[in-house]
């Protein structure tokens, strides 16, 4: 089943990843589950995956979740013409409690392209903006507040744990020295410049920007992303009907390791694929975000079998 996967809304221009693979997984559901027709999109974003699912499977109804008000607005517009088949709820998936069991749960993790591309959100080191990085702009500490409040050792540990950054101690020391001497950074570009200065000169112009891992670490910490994922991995199997499928798309090794371990050890689930599904060469060429995407699938066991 092939679908054109480019989705455009008033604010979001987003190409969802691994669309065909997700559609194929839904198509393989038992017919009685497709007839029941309930699906949870735990990270609806701009509504890209959900729009194509609703288009491809007219019997399905989707409940979409997101904590980003901009994403909620974009998804609402994107899915408006599907009427009552799409329900969108402002919620972090870690806090959600469904009213009934469903046939399919999809989670597309991490930060979306529109969030990165909007400088004022503060996720990007390539576009200068305020140091924010909150998925929900109305809740929690901003990045500049986290940097100010966190002691040097704890900051280094955070950058190492969530960014797997080998220069974490050097970076944390530089950040705290800068804050002490000059006050808060003026924006994301200033922080990225400081981080790059902690790298040996020969490593500053490689394929991966020196600030990549530190920005990832700060974003994960600010939004409690791994804790939320742990909650989802624990709760989502209970949302599924027997034979229903849990699909998770991750974008870095920290997420993927958690998903892999959960799918392997959770007695409620049976892995559909032993190895993660990745984008083909054509998708990687047309959608750079897909290059690091990994899709894992697991099926809810029937407790009576």
Curated annotation (Swiss-Prot):
InterPro entries: RsmH, SAM-dep_MeTrfase_MraW_recog, SAM-dependent_MTases_sf. It is found in: Cytoplasm. Gene3D superfamilies: Putative methyltransferase TM0872, insert domain, Vaccinia Virus protein VP39. GO terms for biological process: rRNA base methylation. One of its GO terms (cellular component) is cytoplasm. Residues 279-305 are annotated as: Disordered. Residues 291-305 have a biased composition (Basic residues). Its main location: cytoplasm. Transmembrane segments: none annotated. Its EC number is 2.1.1.199. This is Ribosomal RNA small subunit methyltransferase H. It comes from Prochlorococcus marinus (strain SARG / CCMP1375 / SS120). The lineage of its organism: Bacteria, Bacillati, Cyanobacteriota, Cyanophyceae, Synechococcales.
């Amino acid at each position: 089943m092939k679908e054109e996967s480019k989705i455009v809304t008033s604010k979001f221009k987003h190409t969802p990843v691994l669309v065909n693979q997700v559609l194929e997984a839904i198509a393989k559901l038992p017919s009685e589950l497709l007839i029941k027709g309930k699906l949870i999109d735990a990270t609806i974003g701009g509504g890209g995956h959900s729009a194509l699912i609703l288009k491809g499977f007219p019997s399905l109804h989707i409940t979409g979740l997101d904590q980003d008000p901009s994403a909620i607005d974009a998804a609402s517009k994107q899915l408006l013409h599907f009427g009552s088949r799409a329900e969108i709820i402002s919620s972090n998936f870690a806090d959600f409690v469904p009213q009934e069991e469903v046939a399919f749960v999809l989670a597309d993790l991490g930060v979306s392209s529109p969030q990165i591309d909007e400088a004022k959100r503060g996720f990007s080191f390539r576009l200068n903006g305020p140091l924010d990085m909150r998925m929900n702009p109305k809740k929690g500490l901003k990045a500049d507040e986290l940097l100010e409040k966190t002691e040097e050792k704890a900051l280094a540990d955070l950058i190492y744990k969530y960014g797997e950054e080998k220069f974490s101690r050097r970076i944390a020391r530089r950040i705290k020295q800068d804050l002490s001497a000059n006050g808060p950074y003026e924006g994301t570009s200033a922080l990225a410049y400081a981080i790059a200065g902690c790298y040996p000169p020969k490593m500053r112009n490689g394929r991966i920007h020196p600030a990549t891992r530190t920005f990832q670490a700060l974003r994960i910490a600010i939004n409690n992303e791994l804790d939320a994922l742990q909650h989802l991995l624990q709760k989502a199997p209970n949302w599924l009907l027997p034979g229903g499928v849990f699909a998770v798309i991750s974008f870095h090794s920290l997420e993927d390791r958690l998903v892999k371990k959960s799918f392997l050890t959770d007695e409620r689930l049976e892995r559909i694929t032993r190895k993660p599904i990745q984008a083909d060469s054509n998708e990687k060429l047309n959608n750079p975000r897909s290059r690091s995407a990994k899709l894992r699938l697991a099926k809810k066991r029937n407790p009576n079998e």
